Protein backbone atom coordinates (compact mmCIF):
# COMPACT_ATOMS: atom_id res chain seq x y z
CA UNK A 1 0.00 0.00 0.00
CA UNK A 2 1.29 3.46 -0.87
CA UNK A 3 1.80 6.15 1.74
CA UNK A 4 -1.16 8.02 0.27
CA UNK A 5 -3.35 4.95 0.52
CA UNK A 6 -2.30 4.35 4.10
CA UNK A 7 -3.18 7.93 4.98
CA UNK A 8 -6.73 7.56 3.75
CA UNK A 9 -7.19 4.16 5.35
CA UNK A 10 -6.11 5.64 8.69
CA UNK A 11 -8.94 8.14 8.37
CA UNK A 12 -11.23 5.42 9.72
CA UNK A 13 -13.81 5.83 6.97
CA UNK A 14 -16.71 3.40 7.09
CA UNK A 15 -16.42 2.32 3.46
CA UNK A 16 -13.08 0.76 2.65
CA UNK A 17 -13.96 1.48 -0.97
CA UNK A 18 -13.82 5.16 -0.12
CA UNK A 19 -10.24 4.81 0.99
CA UNK A 20 -9.47 2.94 -2.22
CA UNK A 21 -11.13 5.60 -4.32
CA UNK A 22 -8.97 8.31 -2.76
CA UNK A 23 -5.84 6.48 -3.80
CA UNK A 24 -6.89 7.14 -7.37
CA UNK A 25 -7.72 10.80 -6.92
CA UNK A 26 -5.29 13.64 -7.28
CA UNK A 27 -7.52 16.02 -5.45
CA UNK A 28 -8.47 18.95 -7.74
CA UNK A 29 -5.60 18.13 -10.05
CA UNK A 30 -7.45 14.97 -10.55
CA UNK A 31 -6.22 11.72 -11.44
CA UNK A 32 -6.26 7.88 -11.18
CA UNK A 33 -6.13 4.63 -13.04
CA UNK A 34 -5.56 3.71 -16.60
CA UNK A 35 -8.47 3.46 -19.04
CA UNK A 36 -6.95 1.25 -21.68
CA UNK A 37 -8.31 -2.32 -21.93
CA UNK A 38 -6.46 -5.34 -20.66
CA UNK A 39 -4.20 -5.80 -17.69
CA UNK A 40 -2.02 -2.74 -17.09
CA UNK A 41 1.70 -3.16 -17.65
CA UNK A 42 3.94 -3.38 -14.65
CA UNK A 43 5.60 -0.06 -13.90
CA UNK A 44 9.11 0.29 -15.21
CA UNK A 45 11.89 2.17 -13.44
CA UNK A 46 12.91 5.48 -14.93
CA UNK A 47 16.32 5.40 -16.56
CA UNK A 48 18.75 8.17 -15.91
CA UNK A 49 20.06 9.24 -19.31
CA UNK A 50 23.10 11.47 -19.40
CA UNK A 51 22.03 15.09 -19.38
CA UNK A 52 22.80 17.34 -22.31
CA UNK A 53 22.99 21.08 -22.73
CA UNK A 54 19.43 21.05 -24.06
CA UNK A 55 18.19 19.26 -20.97
CA UNK A 56 16.57 16.52 -23.02
CA UNK A 57 19.07 13.85 -21.99
CA UNK A 58 20.90 11.37 -24.17
CA UNK A 59 18.70 8.72 -25.83
CA UNK A 60 19.53 5.61 -27.87
CA UNK A 61 19.65 5.82 -31.63
CA UNK A 62 16.35 5.73 -33.56
CA UNK A 63 15.30 2.19 -34.33
CA UNK A 64 16.42 0.71 -31.02
CA UNK A 65 13.67 -1.37 -29.35
CA UNK A 66 14.38 0.46 -26.09
CA UNK A 67 13.04 3.79 -27.37
CA UNK A 68 9.70 5.09 -28.48
CA UNK A 69 8.30 8.28 -29.97
CA UNK A 70 6.78 10.81 -27.56
CA UNK A 71 4.87 13.80 -28.91
CA UNK A 72 6.85 16.99 -28.49
CA UNK A 73 10.02 15.17 -27.50
CA UNK A 74 10.77 12.75 -30.30
CA UNK A 75 12.53 9.52 -29.36
CA UNK A 76 12.86 8.74 -25.65
CA UNK A 77 13.63 5.61 -23.64
CA UNK A 78 10.53 3.44 -23.57
CA UNK A 79 10.47 3.38 -19.77
CA UNK A 80 10.13 7.17 -19.69
CA UNK A 81 7.44 7.17 -22.36
CA UNK A 82 5.20 4.79 -20.43
CA UNK A 83 2.73 6.84 -18.32
CA UNK A 84 2.64 6.63 -14.57
CA UNK A 85 -0.61 6.87 -12.64
CA UNK A 86 -3.23 4.44 -11.44
CA UNK A 87 -3.25 0.81 -12.53
CA UNK A 88 -6.87 -0.24 -11.96
CA UNK A 89 -9.40 -0.88 -14.70
CA UNK A 90 -12.69 0.98 -14.87
CA UNK A 91 -15.96 -0.71 -15.79
CA UNK A 92 -17.23 -0.17 -19.33
CA UNK A 93 -19.11 3.07 -19.93
CA UNK A 94 -21.61 4.18 -22.57
CA UNK A 95 -20.78 7.57 -24.02
CA UNK A 96 -23.60 10.04 -24.62
CA UNK A 97 -24.24 11.16 -28.22
CA UNK A 98 -22.19 14.12 -29.41
CA UNK A 99 -23.91 17.49 -29.42
CA UNK A 100 -23.72 20.15 -32.08
CA UNK A 101 -21.90 23.33 -31.12
CA UNK A 102 -22.68 25.99 -30.23
CA UNK A 103 -25.13 24.54 -27.74
CA UNK A 104 -28.69 25.86 -28.28
CA UNK A 105 -28.73 27.60 -24.90
CA UNK A 106 -25.58 29.50 -25.90
CA UNK A 107 -26.59 30.22 -29.50
CA UNK A 108 -29.98 31.52 -28.34
CA UNK A 109 -28.71 33.63 -25.45
CA UNK A 110 -29.71 37.28 -25.55
CA UNK A 111 -26.41 38.70 -24.23
CA UNK A 112 -22.85 37.82 -23.21
CA UNK A 113 -23.75 37.32 -19.54
CA UNK A 114 -26.44 34.78 -20.43
CA UNK A 115 -24.08 32.98 -22.83
CA UNK A 116 -21.43 32.75 -20.13
CA UNK A 117 -23.91 31.38 -17.61
CA UNK A 118 -25.11 28.76 -20.09
CA UNK A 119 -21.53 27.64 -20.70
CA UNK A 120 -20.81 27.27 -16.98
CA UNK A 121 -24.03 25.36 -16.35
CA UNK A 122 -23.16 23.06 -19.27
CA UNK A 123 -20.23 21.74 -17.21
CA UNK A 124 -22.67 19.79 -15.00
CA UNK A 125 -23.47 16.15 -15.75
CA UNK A 126 -22.09 12.60 -15.57
CA UNK A 127 -18.66 12.03 -17.07
CA UNK A 128 -15.86 9.68 -17.84
CA UNK A 129 -12.77 11.73 -17.09
CA UNK A 130 -9.25 11.12 -18.31
CA UNK A 131 -6.29 13.04 -16.92
CA UNK A 132 -3.15 13.62 -18.99
CA UNK A 133 -0.07 15.55 -17.87
CA UNK A 134 3.33 15.76 -19.53
CA UNK A 135 6.35 17.95 -18.92
CA UNK A 136 7.23 19.70 -22.15
CA UNK A 137 10.19 21.90 -21.20
CA UNK A 138 13.06 21.52 -18.75
CA UNK A 139 14.87 24.61 -17.48
CA UNK A 140 17.59 23.25 -15.20
CA UNK A 141 21.05 22.22 -16.36
CA UNK A 142 20.64 18.64 -15.19
CA UNK A 143 17.02 18.25 -16.36
CA UNK A 144 15.86 14.84 -17.56
CA UNK A 145 12.43 14.07 -19.04
CA UNK A 146 10.02 12.36 -16.67
CA UNK A 147 7.21 9.93 -17.32
CA UNK A 148 3.87 11.49 -18.30
CA UNK A 149 0.84 11.00 -16.07
CA UNK A 150 -2.40 9.30 -17.20
CA UNK A 151 -5.39 8.37 -15.05
CA UNK A 152 -9.17 8.05 -15.13
CA UNK A 153 -12.37 8.53 -13.16
CA UNK A 154 -16.14 8.53 -13.51
CA UNK A 155 -17.51 11.69 -11.99
CA UNK A 156 -20.81 13.43 -11.29
CA UNK A 157 -20.87 17.24 -11.47
CA UNK A 158 -23.92 18.88 -9.88
CA UNK A 159 -25.12 22.46 -9.63
CA UNK A 160 -24.83 23.11 -5.92
CA UNK A 161 -25.97 26.73 -6.04
CA UNK A 162 -27.05 29.22 -8.71
CA UNK A 163 -27.95 32.78 -7.74
CA UNK A 164 -27.42 34.36 -11.15
CA UNK A 165 -24.04 36.02 -10.74
CA UNK A 166 -22.72 33.07 -8.73
CA UNK A 167 -22.70 29.37 -9.71
CA UNK A 168 -21.22 26.57 -7.61
CA UNK A 169 -20.46 23.18 -9.17
CA UNK A 170 -19.66 20.18 -6.95
CA UNK A 171 -17.71 17.18 -8.29
CA UNK A 172 -18.37 13.73 -6.80
CA UNK A 173 -16.37 10.66 -7.74
CA UNK A 174 -18.48 7.56 -8.38
CA UNK A 175 -16.00 4.86 -9.37
CA UNK A 176 -16.84 1.44 -10.79
CA UNK A 177 -13.78 -0.79 -10.96
CA UNK A 178 -13.52 -3.88 -13.11
CA UNK A 179 -13.44 -7.12 -11.14
CA UNK A 180 -11.11 -9.96 -12.22
CA UNK A 181 -14.08 -11.74 -13.84
CA UNK A 182 -14.90 -8.63 -15.87
CA UNK A 183 -17.96 -7.59 -13.87
CA UNK A 184 -18.20 -4.07 -12.42
CA UNK A 185 -17.61 -3.50 -8.71
CA UNK A 186 -20.08 -1.81 -6.41
CA UNK A 187 -19.83 1.98 -6.77
CA UNK A 188 -17.09 3.63 -4.74
CA UNK A 189 -18.06 7.19 -3.93
CA UNK A 190 -16.33 10.19 -2.44
CA UNK A 191 -16.72 13.94 -2.42
CA UNK A 192 -14.25 15.51 -4.83
CA UNK A 193 -13.38 19.11 -5.71
CA UNK A 194 -15.63 22.16 -6.10
CA UNK A 195 -15.55 25.08 -8.51
CA UNK A 196 -17.27 28.38 -7.74
CA UNK A 197 -17.89 30.89 -10.53
CA UNK A 198 -18.49 34.57 -9.69
CA UNK A 199 -19.33 37.31 -12.19
CA UNK A 200 -17.24 40.50 -11.96
CA UNK A 201 -15.55 39.32 -8.77
CA UNK A 202 -13.45 42.11 -7.26
CA UNK A 203 -12.53 40.29 -4.01
CA UNK A 204 -10.32 37.26 -4.59
CA UNK A 205 -8.16 35.10 -2.33
CA UNK A 206 -5.15 33.85 -4.26
CA UNK A 207 -2.51 31.28 -3.39
CA UNK A 208 0.86 32.82 -2.41
CA UNK A 209 2.97 29.75 -1.66
CA UNK A 210 3.87 28.16 1.70
CA UNK A 211 0.25 27.00 2.26
CA UNK A 212 -0.77 30.67 2.39
CA UNK A 213 -3.58 32.61 0.71
CA UNK A 214 -4.07 36.38 0.59
CA UNK A 215 -6.78 38.78 -0.50
CA UNK A 216 -6.42 40.45 -3.87
CA UNK A 217 -8.73 43.35 -4.66
CA UNK A 218 -9.38 44.15 -8.31
CA UNK A 219 -10.85 47.36 -9.67
CA UNK A 220 -14.10 47.60 -11.59
CA UNK A 221 -12.40 48.05 -14.94
CA UNK A 222 -10.31 44.91 -14.51
CA UNK A 223 -13.25 42.66 -13.67
CA UNK A 224 -15.85 44.08 -16.06
CA UNK A 225 -17.38 41.18 -17.99
CA UNK A 226 -15.13 38.60 -16.32
CA UNK A 227 -15.83 35.47 -14.26
CA UNK A 228 -13.60 34.22 -11.47
CA UNK A 229 -13.17 30.51 -10.93
CA UNK A 230 -12.36 29.51 -7.35
CA UNK A 231 -11.33 25.88 -6.87
CA UNK A 232 -11.62 24.08 -3.53
CA UNK A 233 -10.17 20.85 -2.20
CA UNK A 234 -12.15 17.77 -1.18
CA UNK A 235 -12.44 19.21 2.36
CA UNK A 236 -13.68 22.57 0.97
CA UNK A 237 -10.46 24.38 1.86
CA UNK A 238 -9.31 26.81 -0.85
CA UNK A 239 -6.93 25.73 -3.57
CA UNK A 240 -6.69 28.58 -6.09
CA UNK A 241 -8.70 31.39 -7.63
CA UNK A 242 -8.26 33.28 -10.89
CA UNK A 243 -10.08 35.78 -13.06
CA UNK A 244 -10.84 34.90 -16.65
CA UNK A 245 -13.13 35.61 -19.56
CA UNK A 246 -15.46 33.55 -21.69
CA UNK A 247 -15.24 33.83 -25.46
CA UNK A 248 -18.00 32.57 -27.74
CA UNK A 249 -17.34 32.48 -31.49
CA UNK A 250 -19.29 30.02 -33.60
CA UNK A 251 -18.65 26.52 -32.24
CA UNK A 252 -16.02 27.83 -29.81
CA UNK A 253 -16.90 28.51 -26.18
CA UNK A 254 -13.78 28.86 -24.04
CA UNK A 255 -12.91 30.45 -20.71
CA UNK A 256 -9.27 31.54 -20.36
CA UNK A 257 -7.79 32.41 -16.99
CA UNK A 258 -5.18 34.93 -16.07
CA UNK A 259 -1.84 33.54 -14.89
CA UNK A 260 -2.30 32.24 -11.35
CA UNK A 261 -0.49 30.25 -8.67
CA UNK A 262 -1.67 26.89 -7.35
CA UNK A 263 -0.30 24.48 -4.73
CA UNK A 264 1.37 21.29 -5.90
CA UNK A 265 -1.16 18.75 -7.16
CA UNK A 266 -1.50 15.53 -5.20
CA UNK A 267 -0.03 13.55 -8.11
CA UNK A 268 3.25 15.44 -7.56
CA UNK A 269 3.13 16.17 -3.85
CA UNK A 270 4.92 13.06 -2.62
CA UNK A 271 7.39 12.64 -5.48
CA UNK A 272 8.65 16.15 -6.32
CA UNK A 273 10.81 18.23 -3.99
CA UNK A 274 12.33 20.57 -6.57
CA UNK A 275 9.42 23.04 -6.79
CA UNK A 276 6.56 24.22 -4.60
CA UNK A 277 4.24 26.32 -6.77
CA UNK A 278 2.41 25.63 -10.02
CA UNK A 279 2.02 28.85 -12.01
CA UNK A 280 -0.18 28.63 -15.05
CA UNK A 281 -2.94 29.61 -17.39
CA UNK A 282 -5.85 27.28 -17.86
CA UNK A 283 -8.83 27.03 -20.18
CA UNK A 284 -12.27 25.48 -19.97
CA UNK A 285 -13.44 24.48 -23.46
CA UNK A 286 -16.88 23.10 -24.34
CA UNK A 287 -16.72 20.15 -26.75
CA UNK A 288 -19.37 18.09 -28.60
CA UNK A 289 -18.82 15.29 -26.07
CA UNK A 290 -18.48 17.36 -22.88
CA UNK A 291 -15.67 19.71 -21.95
CA UNK A 292 -11.92 19.98 -21.65
CA UNK A 293 -9.77 21.49 -18.91
CA UNK A 294 -6.52 22.56 -20.60
CA UNK A 295 -3.56 23.62 -18.46
CA UNK A 296 -0.26 25.26 -19.32
CA UNK A 297 1.75 25.14 -16.12
CA UNK A 298 5.15 26.41 -15.04
CA UNK A 299 6.73 24.60 -12.09
CA UNK A 300 8.58 27.10 -9.94
CA UNK A 301 10.27 27.70 -6.61
CA UNK A 302 8.61 30.28 -4.39
CA UNK A 303 7.87 31.04 -0.77
CA UNK A 304 10.38 29.83 1.81
CA UNK A 305 12.19 27.70 -0.75
CA UNK A 306 13.19 30.83 -2.66
CA UNK A 307 14.89 32.34 0.40
CA UNK A 308 15.75 35.98 -0.17
CA UNK A 309 15.88 35.66 -3.93
CA UNK A 310 13.49 37.90 -5.85
CA UNK A 311 14.15 36.50 -9.31
CA UNK A 312 11.72 33.76 -10.41
CA UNK A 313 13.15 30.24 -10.29
CA UNK A 314 11.43 27.99 -12.83
CA UNK A 315 12.34 24.33 -13.23
CA UNK A 316 9.99 22.97 -15.92
CA UNK A 317 6.82 23.47 -17.94
CA UNK A 318 3.90 21.06 -18.12
CA UNK A 319 0.90 20.54 -20.38
CA UNK A 320 -2.28 19.15 -18.84
CA UNK A 321 -5.47 17.92 -20.51
CA UNK A 322 -8.40 16.76 -18.38
CA UNK A 323 -11.07 15.44 -20.73
CA UNK A 324 -14.67 15.21 -19.49
CA UNK A 325 -16.83 12.98 -21.74
CA UNK A 326 -20.55 12.64 -21.03
CA UNK A 327 -21.84 9.16 -20.26
CA UNK A 328 -25.27 7.56 -20.07
CA UNK A 329 -24.12 4.50 -18.11
CA UNK A 330 -23.23 3.38 -15.58
CA UNK A 331 -25.63 5.45 -13.54
CA UNK A 332 -23.95 7.77 -11.05
CA UNK A 333 -27.18 8.50 -9.18
CA UNK A 334 -25.72 7.19 -5.91
CA UNK A 335 -24.19 10.66 -5.68
CA UNK A 336 -27.70 11.95 -4.96
CA UNK A 337 -27.99 9.65 -1.94
CA UNK A 338 -24.65 10.85 -0.61
CA UNK A 339 -25.66 14.51 -0.81
CA UNK A 340 -29.04 13.87 0.80
CA UNK A 341 -27.24 12.44 3.83
CA UNK A 342 -24.27 14.81 4.01
CA UNK A 343 -25.30 17.99 2.18
CA UNK A 344 -26.34 19.89 5.30
CA UNK A 345 -22.96 19.24 6.91
CA UNK A 346 -20.99 20.39 3.89
CA UNK A 347 -23.15 23.52 3.68
CA UNK A 348 -21.98 24.39 7.21
CA UNK A 349 -18.37 23.80 6.14
CA UNK A 350 -18.77 26.15 3.17
CA UNK A 351 -20.36 28.87 5.33
CA UNK A 352 -17.61 28.56 7.93
CA UNK A 353 -14.96 28.91 5.27
CA UNK A 354 -16.74 31.92 3.75
CA UNK A 355 -16.72 33.59 7.17
CA UNK A 356 -13.02 32.89 7.68
CA UNK A 357 -12.08 34.16 4.23
CA UNK A 358 -14.20 37.30 4.59
CA UNK A 359 -12.50 38.42 7.80
CA UNK A 360 -8.89 37.65 6.87
CA UNK A 361 -6.55 39.55 4.56
CA UNK A 362 -4.11 36.67 4.70
CA UNK A 363 -4.13 33.21 6.25
CA UNK A 364 -2.20 29.94 6.22
CA UNK A 365 -3.21 26.33 6.73
CA UNK A 366 -1.46 23.78 8.90
CA UNK A 367 -0.84 20.52 7.07
CA UNK A 368 -1.98 18.42 10.04
CA UNK A 369 -3.16 18.59 13.63
CA UNK A 370 -2.40 15.72 16.00
CA UNK A 371 -1.26 13.67 13.04
CA UNK A 372 -4.50 14.11 11.09
CA UNK A 373 -5.14 16.13 7.95
CA UNK A 374 -8.11 18.48 7.66
CA UNK A 375 -10.13 16.18 5.42
CA UNK A 376 -9.90 13.41 8.03
CA UNK A 377 -11.79 15.46 10.62
CA UNK A 378 -14.55 16.23 8.12
CA UNK A 379 -14.81 12.81 6.54
CA UNK A 380 -14.82 11.10 9.90
CA UNK A 381 -17.86 13.15 10.90
CA UNK A 382 -19.58 12.60 7.54
CA UNK A 383 -19.01 8.87 7.83
CA UNK A 384 -21.32 8.81 10.86
CA UNK A 385 -24.03 10.56 8.85
CA UNK A 386 -23.68 8.02 6.07
CA UNK A 387 -24.06 5.29 8.69
CA UNK A 388 -27.44 6.68 9.69
CA UNK A 389 -26.63 8.97 12.61
CA UNK A 390 -29.24 11.77 12.77
CA UNK A 391 -27.92 15.15 11.71
CA UNK A 392 -27.53 17.64 14.56
CA UNK A 393 -26.95 21.09 13.08
CA UNK A 394 -25.68 22.64 16.31
CA UNK A 395 -23.21 19.82 16.91
CA UNK A 396 -22.02 19.97 13.30
CA UNK A 397 -21.54 23.72 13.58
CA UNK A 398 -19.43 23.33 16.71
CA UNK A 399 -17.35 20.58 15.12
CA UNK A 400 -16.70 22.52 11.92
CA UNK A 401 -15.80 25.82 13.59
CA UNK A 402 -13.56 24.16 16.14
CA UNK A 403 -11.81 22.12 13.46
CA UNK A 404 -11.11 25.09 11.21
CA UNK A 405 -9.80 27.14 14.12
CA UNK A 406 -7.13 24.50 14.70
CA UNK A 407 -5.93 24.51 11.09
CA UNK A 408 -6.22 28.16 10.04
CA UNK A 409 -3.66 30.59 11.39
CA UNK A 410 -2.73 34.15 10.57
CA UNK A 411 -3.92 37.67 11.48
CA UNK A 412 -7.59 38.57 11.30
Residue locations for each model-derived region?
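N-terminal pre-domain segments of enzymes
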Residues: 43-110
Amino acid sequence: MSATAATYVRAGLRHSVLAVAFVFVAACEHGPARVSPGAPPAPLPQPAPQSTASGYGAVPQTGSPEITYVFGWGDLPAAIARPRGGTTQGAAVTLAPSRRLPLPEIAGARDAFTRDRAAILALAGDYRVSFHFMESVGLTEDYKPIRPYHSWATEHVRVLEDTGRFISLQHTLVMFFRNPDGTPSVPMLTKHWRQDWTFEDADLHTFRGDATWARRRADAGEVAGSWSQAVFQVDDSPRYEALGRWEHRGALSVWTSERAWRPLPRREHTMRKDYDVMEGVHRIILTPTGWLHEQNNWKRVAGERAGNRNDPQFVAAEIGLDRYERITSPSLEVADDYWKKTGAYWAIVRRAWADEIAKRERFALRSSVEGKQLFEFHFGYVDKLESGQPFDAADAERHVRATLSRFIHGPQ
